[in-house]
Amino acid sequence: MYYKDILETIGNTPLVKLNKIVADLPCTVLAKVESTNPGNSVKDRMALKMVEDAEADGRLKPGGTIVEGTSGNTGMGLAIAAVVKGYKCIFVTTDKQSKEKVDALKSVGAEVIVCPTDVDPKDSRSYYSVSKRLGDEIPNAWYVNQYDNPSNCLLYTSPSPRDR
């Protein structure tokens, strides 16, 4: 079996039976191994869902730019989707973020802007404010806003075709 692209592998994570930790329970307990997603995180699943929903309703257009404030895992999921689908990515993070995570995002083509941590979220220098401003100012940009994005929540409340 093979997949037409890396995005088809997102969510197709294995179920593993837990044995010792649930030995006293009268049922089978299974765990999804989300680290087998291409970005090594459950966040790949919600990143792809947000991108697909934004494409479907016209918020994200061909050749567009994905803008988000992220500490890494959501950004990696968004970046993987972006590189496959042909979008540019600009991620805004804080100076607390590790160099390795910033470098990982850059390695998949994302531009990363680092903001100070020790400012109020409403401060114009905060990563929340900078990412929102960039989303508003850059032509053909889509500001993901993962914390308030309904697609993020909906992913976990309805059956997903990616749950196999």
What annotation goes with each model-predicted range?
Residues 1-158, 164:
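PLP-dependent amino-acid enzyme catalytic core
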